[in-house]
């Protein structure tokens, strides 16, 4: 072979190697990015409609499944009974986008996850139609239904606008996650572009928006529920239930002439910190905040997870305490006002951490992933994040919260003691004439469940609404469902069980405490949003029940 031919052969060989390397790059390494590119999204979705997508279940209840449509020769996504009750969790799967668990677990549900590689190879050689895996959630349907029914019943006048989250303190498993108003994801799964677009436009135009997940993606001023965080910081500094405090109706913010008042500008509670906590008096908390440095206050908030997101599989926004430039801002923040803004998820984590003797567990929504043959691909394991507070402080807080439940002004219809804190947060530029955000966080000592409720409005809610009479009944309904007690307006669940249902031991809800007591909205034009609406910096009152 002469020199010229040899050069041509070498050059051709190099080109072949480059071609193979480029092919490997495009087909293997770069493939996921190309597949998920917005311009390829609709084409990828159409391909997925050609295979059977996996089920989403909760304790055996089928929330989402795929049915073969003879007319279109494609698999149609079908959502189960009360789909609007579940859509803040499941999200939707459409031609243009996905959200919620449908997005977060898409690789498993579509069968594209590496954990299902063996199944894909078998399908290739056997000629079996490719199928996706299944996702089992930690949600308990009876608790979810209790939360949803309570939100729809409200104060007797109609549906409320708000969110609910219940957590198992010992594991972090999310037992209920409800948001109202909500939407039916079924029309978004239509094969008709026109139908999907029309429904999407209707949802976007609705007010209050059903697309906001108020349980996880709308941080709002928590009012007096935040006093449990402030109290944790104060207890660390030596304050206790018998510490003397003023019951004066107002105080002056440090280094200012600005007054801060109790709810209604009234004398509040007795002369001890324990009674000030029970009656949710603002003045003692503002005065005692002088004992704390800004960093100590921030550290306590951070230890409870404020500022974090948890990647649970639905759209989330981080809670915040905002900037605290001086002692006056610290006093306002200490009562859950100014720029403090929490989600029900974060407030539920705070309650669960106290119930778990001060240990914060990572919240999770996915209990297990399985292949079509029910072989387990993934099983959730509880994960301890940190010790937020000492066991001693947790027990002190529990006692204070049990007393607060007794003085809150709402009726405890449970047959066991409840540890709780209510909140009624003013907000906006005209806070005195705005409907307050009402809150309730609670847990049942000796039982492995904690709950947080936020109500921002709805039928029958007005400027005089308070936490115990609006949010409190919703939270207690969820706790009653957790304990197996009858709940108002509830019905016996009649959901169809998955034929593949097999109970698992992982994150199984129990009403007995263990010894240690331990959204995502993606795609082109995706539906869904999250907002943060913090309290007005000049708001200096915060109200609670019985004040």
Regions found by a protein language model. Give the residues of each.
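Periplasmic/cell-envelope proteins involved in peptidoglycan metabolism and beta-lactam response
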Residues: 1-195, 219-221, 295-303, 461-496, ...
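Residue-level detector of intrinsically disordered, flexible termini
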Residues: 149, 407, 504-506, 531
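Beta-lactam-recognizing serine transpeptidase/beta-lactamase-like catalytic domain environment
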Residues: 174-224, 229-457, 467, 513, ...
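Ser/Thr-rich, Proline-interspersed low-complexity disordered segments
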Residues: 496, 500-510, 514
């Amino acid at each position: 072979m002469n020199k010229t031919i040899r050069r041509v052969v070498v050059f051709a060989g190099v080109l072949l190697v480059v071609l193979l390397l480029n092919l490997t790059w495009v087909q293997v390494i770069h493939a996921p990015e190309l597949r998920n590119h917005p311009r390829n999204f609709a084409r990828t979705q159409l391909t997925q409609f050609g295979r059977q997508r996996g089920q989403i279940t909760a304790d055996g209840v089928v929330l989402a499944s795929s049915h073969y449509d003879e007319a279109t020769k494609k698999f149609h996504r079908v959502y189960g009974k009360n789909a609007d009750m579940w859509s803040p969790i499941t999200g939707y799967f459409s031609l243009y986008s996905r959200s919620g668990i449908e997005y977060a677990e898409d690789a498993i549900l579509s069968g594209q996850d590496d954990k299902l590689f063996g199944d894909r190879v078998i399908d290739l050689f056997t000629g079996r139609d490719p199928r996706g895996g299944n996702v089992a959630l930690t949600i308990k349907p009876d608790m979810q239904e209790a939360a949803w029914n309570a939100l729809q019943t409200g104060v007797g006048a109609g549906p409320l606008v708000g969110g609910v989250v219940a957590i198992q303190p010992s594991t972090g498993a999310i037992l209920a996650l409800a948001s109202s108003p909500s939407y039916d994801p079924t029309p978004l799964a239509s094969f008709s572009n026109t139908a999907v677009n029309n429904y999407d436009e209707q949802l976007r135009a609705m007010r209050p928006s059903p697309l906001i997940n108020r349980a996880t993606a709308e941080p709002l001023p928590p009012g007096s529920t935040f006093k449990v965080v402030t109290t944790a910081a104060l207890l660390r500094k030596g304050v206790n239930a018998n510490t003397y405090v003023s019951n004066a109706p107002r105080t002056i913010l440090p280094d200012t002439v600005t007054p801060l008042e109790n709810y209604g500008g009234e004398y509040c509670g007795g002369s001890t910190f324990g009674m000030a906590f029970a009656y949710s008096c603002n003045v003692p908390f503002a005065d005692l905040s002088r004992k704390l440095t800004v960093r100590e206050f921030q550290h306590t908030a951070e230890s409870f997870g404020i500022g974090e997101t948890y990647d649970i599989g639905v759209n989330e926004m981080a809670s915040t305490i905002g900037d605290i430039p001086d002692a006056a801002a610290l006093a306002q923040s200490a009562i859950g006002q100014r720029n403090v803004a929490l989600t029900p998820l974060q407030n539920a984590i705070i309650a669960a951490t106290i119930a778990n003797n001060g240990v914060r567990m990572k919240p999770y929504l996915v209990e297990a992933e399985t292949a079509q043959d029910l072989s387990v691909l993934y099983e959730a394991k509880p994960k301890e994040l940190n010790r937020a507070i000492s066991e001693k402080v947790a027990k002190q807080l529990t006692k204070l919260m049990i007393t607060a439940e007794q003085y809150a002004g709402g009726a405890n219809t449970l047959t066991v003691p409840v540890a709780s804190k209510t909140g009624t947060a003013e907000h906006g530029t005209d806070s005195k004439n705005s409907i307050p955000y009402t809150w309730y966080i609670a847990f049942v000592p000796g039982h492995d469940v904690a709950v947080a409720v936020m109500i921002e409005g709805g039928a029958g809610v007005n400027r005089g609404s308070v936490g115990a009479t609006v949010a409190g009944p919703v939270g207690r309904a969820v706790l009653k469902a957790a304990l197996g007690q009858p709940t108002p307006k509830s019905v016996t669940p009649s959901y169809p069980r998955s034929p593949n249902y097999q109970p698992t031991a992982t994150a199984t809800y129990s009403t007995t405490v263990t010894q240690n007591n331990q959204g995502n909205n993606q795609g082109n034009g995706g539906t869904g949003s999250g907002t943060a609406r913090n309290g007005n910096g000049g708001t200096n009152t915060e109200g609670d029940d019985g004040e």
